[in-house]
Amino acid sequence: MSARLIIAVVAAITLAGAGPRSREAEIGSLITRPAAVEIADHGYTPEQRGRVAMAQYARCKFGRTPRRVSEYLQLPTAESLAIVHRLATDDCLVSGEIIFQSSQMRGYLFGEMYRLHQGTPPQNWKYPITPLDLVNSPADDAQRDLRVNFMLLTMTDCLHKADPALVRDVVLNAPASIKQKAAYRSLIPKLSACVPKGMNFELSRSVIESAFGEYLYRSLVPAIAVGAGKSR
């Protein structure tokens, strides 16, 4: 099966066995560039494999084309959601296919940048950060992805104010790892108090990780806080 990356509605992954191309990519990555996605089963569920694959894809994509990814993430949310397919290339996929929402791809890229930022001296970080705006909500007739993204960031802001370490633990620990599972066990009971009114879509772990990654990276500069004199 040739490598394919598909932007679609459902997050999932199917990877074929490794062949000559994967061995070549593995050897080359030790010298020149981050490895492409190649996941063994390791006892993961299909849902866990999907999250692991998305995190690995984001790591590879930013590692190989950091300037391009950074420029993409600086665009207004509506514009970046609309052109995500420009980053969806198979250079970071050994074999098989990855299927995920455009907003999830965007969020995992933000999460990867946040992880790297945490390990980099501030004076050496050269990628701009576009601050959050949690006051100016999208219009009622705005595209659904934009409205959903705003609701997720608002939810994350609520959770972060209640327990910032917990939000960071979800993003900084590897998907499906023991530490991340522990973070989720603590997080789940807190979710209901922070879910915005009218939010009627599935809140999967991949959606949560995407929102948390974007929130944390864009909060590295002062965010415009919720409730600054604007009625909803």
Task: Pin down the residues of each PLM region.
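Bacterial N-terminal signal peptides that target proteins for export
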Residues: 1-7
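A cross-kingdom marker for long, charged
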Residues: 181-232
